[in-house]
Regions:
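An N-terminal, well-structured beta->alpha segment
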Residues: 9-73, 77-79, 154-181
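Active-site flanking residues adjacent to catalytic metal/cofactor-binding acidic residues
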Residues: 23, 58, 108, 185-188
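Short, glycine-/Ser/Thr-/acidic-enriched flexible segments
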Residues: 26, 61, 112, 126-127, ...
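Gly/Ser/Thr-rich beta-alpha loop segments that engage phosphate groups in nucleotides
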Residues: 26-29, 59, 88, 120, ...
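N-terminal small/polar loop signature for handling phosphorylated ligands or for N-terminal nucleophile
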Residues: 54-117, 199-242
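Gly/Ser/Thr-enriched, mixed-charge loops and adjacent short helices
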Residues: 117-240
Length: 242
């Protein structure tokens, strides 16, 4: 039994060393990051922040529901509450963290390939948690043998989208935009597609769009705009509608 526990600890430590980066947590799902690791990070994050309630959202990756179940189970293991905001961009979680003065977590691997997943964490007030501001403390807390009990997260219908959109309108009111702006948008099958219609109903831009359907398999091209080859379809969209 002791040998098994030691092996489990070594395995967890090796995975944590691989996935904890300077500003976030990222790894190949099912390999360096999995439900057990997500549970431990959820528990560690809940212990690290002093607040009783944590905002949680996620993007459209195919492994996100499993990650959500495990991460939220870790949070709830120490009896903390969750404000679930659903399928949203990272900006939404950070904005709500600032508005509500609550810590937040978004399950995402940003522009990494589809087989990756991870987490971005922030303190209350949308203060990012990075290598020199608490992320390594969370890693240490996660590096323990704990009883893992993962339960299906019960998704409720209480989202905070309205608060986010009202915040955007306070920053830039629709009335302040005197000229109709023309945009070409490639959603890259990422989570932006989940909020685009609401944003466009507010600001009423002239938009030509492609790939707004949220699909964690990224069937049209990788969700990495830093690679210029992924911008080919967007360039053609703009040229064709000039």
């Amino acid at each position: 039994w002791i040998h098994e526990q030691y092996n489990n600890w070594v395995m967890t430590k090796n995975k944590l060393d691989l996935i904890f980066k300077s500003y976030d947590i990222r790894g190949v799902y099912g390999d360096s990051i999995d439900q057990d690791i997500a549970y431990k990070i959820g528990k560690a994050f809940a212990e690290f922040v002093p607040d009783d309630t944590i905002i949680v959202g996620h993007d459209g990756r195919v492994s996100n529901i499993e990650m959500l179940d495990a991460f939220t189970s870790g949070i709830k293991s120490i009896n903390k509450e969750i404000i679930y905001v659903g399928l949203v961009p990272t900006d939404t979680v950070y904005s709500l963290s600032g508005l509500l003065k609550k810590p937040g977590a978004i399950i995402t691997a940003s522009h990494n390939p589809k087989n990756y997943n991870g987490l971005k964490l922030c303190n209350a007030g949308a203060i990012p948690i990075g290598e020199n501001s608490g992320l390594m403390d969370i890693k240490k807390l996660a590096d323990r043998n704990v009883e893992i009990r993962i339960e299906k997260f019960k998704i409720n219908d209480k989202h905070l989208g309205n608060e986010y959109y009202e915040h955007l309108k306070n920053l830039v009111s629709p009335e302040s935009i005197s000229q109709k702006l023309n945009f070409g948008i490639d959603g890259g099958n990422g989570v932006f597609g989940a909020v685009f219609d609401t944003l466009n109903n507010i600001y009423k831009f002239n938009v030509k769009s492609i790939y707004l359907e949220v699909d964690g398999n990224f069937p049209n091209h990788p969700a990495d705009p830093s690679d210029e080859s992924n911008l080919t379809d967007l360039k053609n969209l703009v040229i064709d509608n000039d």
